A protein has these predicted regions:
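Conserved phosphoryl-transfer catalytic core
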Residues: 30-44
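Asp-based, Mg2+/Mn2+-dependent phosphohydrolase catalytic module
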Residues: 1-15, 36, 47-49, 53-55, ...
Length: 208
């Protein structure tokens, strides 16, 4: 689906989202391993809840990117139960399950004639959502979680921040076509984003 603002140069046109830990999380901060010890579709809809602002973010993304896909390693019965229970399936062009996420995304992009340079993966698990995807040549950022803070990566606090992050990326793309340095999402909106303290790398630059 094409964005409403057709005059804006967009840094990322094709967005791929992880499922568990990105769109939905265990209720009341419970460990996911309580569920995965004996997973069933029926228990899944009781154990998990949508993360903060997910529906509003997906609605916004659906109107601003060309492609929105879900890439998950959850078992299909569990994933289907959650997608149907929370009415999430309507937002996605395709739901991809199983396999190396980097390979799956690269294959999807090739089949549809899309560029890796225009694509973004968002997830919470570095070993599944970050490293294999980056290795495949696709940019990836992490949802900030306690369990992934030992890994160096660009981060957002949740999917609810993704539309704003993409907007900053668009601004950066319009301002600097070759090399980009701009404030982080929080600092971009601070009172003095031009100071040294308010200047950090947000958008990865080819060759940087």
């Amino acid at each position: 689906m094409n964005p409403k603002d057709g005059t804006r140069t967009r840094r990322f046109k094709h967005v791929f989202l992880d499922a568990e830990g990105t769109l939905y999380v265990p209720r009341n901060g419970m460990s996911r391993w309580y569920f995965w010890a004996r997973p069933t579709p029926e228990d899944a809809i009781r154990f998990f809840e949508l993360d903060k602002g997910v529906i509003a973010a997906l609605e916004k993304l659906r109107s601003e990117v060309d492609t929105l896909c879900l890439v998950s390693l959850n078992s299909e019965p569990v994933l289907d139960a959650i997608l149907d229970h929370f009415d999430l399936r309507r937002f996605f062009d395709e739901v991809m399950v199983n396999g190396n996420k980097g390979d799956r995304i690269a294959r999807y992009l090739k089949e549809h004639g899309f560029s890796k340079a225009d694509s973004l993966m968002v997830g919470d698990t570095p070993g599944l959502d970050l490293y294999p995807v980056v290795k495949a040549g696709v940019h990836s950022i992490l949802i900030d979680r306690d369990y992934n803070r030992g890994h160096a990566a660009e981060r957002i606090k949740g999917v609810y921040e993704l539309p704003a992050w993409l907007r900053v990326a668009d601004i950066a793309e319009n301002m600097f076509k070759e090399r980009v340095r701009i404030a982080t999402l929080d600092e971009f909106f601070c009172g003095d984003a031009r100071t040294v303290n308010c200047t950090k790398s947000l958008i990865a630059v080819s060759g940087a």
